């Protein structure tokens, strides 16, 4: 029986440990709730090879979600050879955190995707950027960006009933990404928003869980953001390796490396405990490598590594799940002008600010115009409901696996 004639018996693999990345759950829910997929779920955390092999024998398709290769490759490295030895079933692998990092190897991830014999690599980036990163393994690279979960992110109260004008909860972007656009933009709006009579609640020391994040957005008339990702993506680790070596040279005191057993053990802790641990190591005598390196001033890395380094031709920025979350709660977005995977259009679906911030005052005036804010919010909501929910993405993946 052809796959398209019935529900696909799908093996859905993810790496599950306490995390506040709500989009992990959104993608999982997209497939488990979609009528075209008959899903069996497995957590690759400690998954025995023989157990995986047994399930592979019964699957028509295999999907590895972003979590399998986003923060660590420790567990994906164990399952990749077993996936590569399968005798049946097409494999579609999503890719998480598509930027070069001192703590994570992009070419090693690509190599493991090749070992797993991925038939389709689903990138969050534009297709040409994904091909630039993963094209060497011969798999089909397809752009499958994030989307809206309308069950989790529903329209909030009417704008007049919301208590915050502009709100953001998240983390500062690290200096090793090579641009400070988001951090500077949030700082700019934090300063100028009150000057325009706006109540601003912007913090960069905490990421909320899905329900808390949806509730917070529902309290905000607007939020501020930029595209996710980095201008300096590369299929190899040569450039980021030099940055990593420099950061290690700057270490002082007791620093727990990102690949130590202590760091790996911390991933298993409940989110509140992890948050407390991060706070303690950020200011105490013992530090995690990541928190230690995040204290390095952006200008220091920029002048040493990025100022004279040309950007690659591949566009390494992308729309993120948080953009769709805001659209779902009908929270107006003020954002630096960008492509957003060619989905969102400036001043039609978000209020656009120029890269030099020269029109911030004008953007805030437009935001304060109730009719303009409502128009942009409704335009974005209608666009996303018409073709950019996770149900739409799951249907697209179904076509990829059955064509």
Language model region names:
Residues 186-202, 250:
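A conserved nucleotide-sugar
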Residues 160-177, 219:
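Conserved donor-binding/catalytic core segment of Leloir-type glycosyltransferases
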Residues 55, 112-114, 209, 216, ...:
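Structural alpha-helical scaffold elements that stabilize or flank donor/cofactor-binding regions
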